[in-house]
Amino acid sequence: MSSETEDKPSVNGNEENKASSSAPASQVAEPVTGSAAFQAKYAGRDIAAGLITGAMAIPLSIGIAMMSDYPIKVGLATVAFASFVGWINAWFRPGNYIGSPGIAAGLAPVLALGVANFGIQNMAFCICLTAIMQAIIWHLNWQRYLLIAVPVYLVEGLLAGVGLKILLRFFEFAYEIPAESVTEEFWNDARIQMCAISAIGFAGFVYLFSKFRDTQPAVPYFALIIGGVILAQVMTVPMIYVEDVPLHFRLPLPEDFTTMLMIYMVLYCLMLAIIDVIEQVMSNAAIEKIDPLKRKCNSNNSLLAIWIANLGSSFFGGMTNLDGLAKSTTNKLAGAYTKFSVLIIGCVVTFFMLNTEYLDYLPKFALAAIMVFTGYKMIAGLVHVTHYGPYALMLALICGGLVYKVGIFEGLLIAMAIHAIVHFMVYTKHDNMPGRAVIKRYFDNLKKDSSSVS
């Protein structure tokens, strides 16, 4: 994920400045407008891109749902619902033009933390409360302050810690064998064979990704899944099981809670809301750079679609969503030009959500390769932090280690506290500034710097 902040967008998020090749160099280019939701001239490209990205989103969403300790069917329902909301929102207030919404790998351990502490029965209320907090942030346009209050390198450190959790969680699938093949000896012939298959699959996936990432990044996903399905027909390997859970529509109200539990849930939802918003702002910065027509993004408009989708998903026990960079990049390289592709993605995901029996053909080793690679990419995001200097890299590494060791919530808070203490000590001891002046300077800088962030 890119860790660069985005440029300030134009007032009209739908405008695109495009110079005519036949016009004089001194002539001011006329803005070219077009719907973010649908343009007839791009319909064919958007349909093809939606089919490709939708198929690629299935295994990725399955892995994220499993990492979040949510039913796979609920995760797919969240992706489908968020896609439909994103397309509808694009008619009125587009945040970006090719971003593909869905459940995010970076939030998976955060959701798993909520499930472990509050129970799955209270997560609908947590998602609803998170959506309400995001609605307040959207209404007051506070998202422009968040990347300043919470430095980008801390977010990259958090994502690296999350990536390590994902990598280790799904690495177990690489050597898992069927129950009937388990013996007293751990490294028996069946497990060694499974490790060899997983290694070959992962190496092939990485090779294809490096070869096609700038042209057709969905190719390695298709190759791995198709190869895994074929292999599963000729030999016995552990398969994904998707429980066909019913989706109930009900009010997202808390159950069996105490006062202290409610306080903890509020703090948890605040953390979840902030991380979700920051990830969306960072994704928009990257999506703007890969837009085929160089159109500007509006992060506050993207936040509108996020909180509406989160609020709606809480009524069927769904998860949080944002425009994921992996799916958005695939969408762009597959030929998407408008959010009409997102509508097609939603339809593809809906088909598999309603026909979960087709997902039982996915081998676990194929899912392991995809999710281990996803975790690695999140850890590799620390490379971006090197541009901020050694202090930022050190703090990002500390944040990542804390997130992995003590948890998302506690790790981020401790890292932010360390960051605040270091800056306070530098200003008070080195620059001899009074403590009150340091605090005032911080808020003055926060207000001033936010004017350059959309």
Question: Where on the chain are the PLM-derived regions?
Answer:
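Membrane-embedded helical hairpins/re-entrant loop segments and their flanking transmembrane helices
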Residues: S35-G44, A48-L51, A55-M56, L60-N89, ...
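Intrinsically disordered, low-complexity non-transmembrane regions of multi-pass membrane transporters
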Residues: M1-G44, V242-F249, Y427-S454
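Alpha-helical transmembrane segments of multi-pass membrane transport proteins
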Residues: A25-A36, I52-G54, A108, I120-Q121, ...
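Helix-loop-helix junctions that connect adjacent transmembrane segments
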Residues: P178-I192, L231-I274
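Membrane-embedded alpha-helical modules
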Residues: V32, A43, W91-R93, L113-M239, ...
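Hydrophobic alpha-helical segments within and immediately flanking transmembrane helices
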Residues: L60, A77-N89, A104-A116, I345-V348
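Short hydrophobic alpha-helical membrane-embedded segments
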Residues: G50-A57, L76-A80, S100-A105, Q193-I200, ...
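Membrane-interfacial helix-loop connectors
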Residues: M67-D69, A105-F118, I287-D291, L333-A334, ...
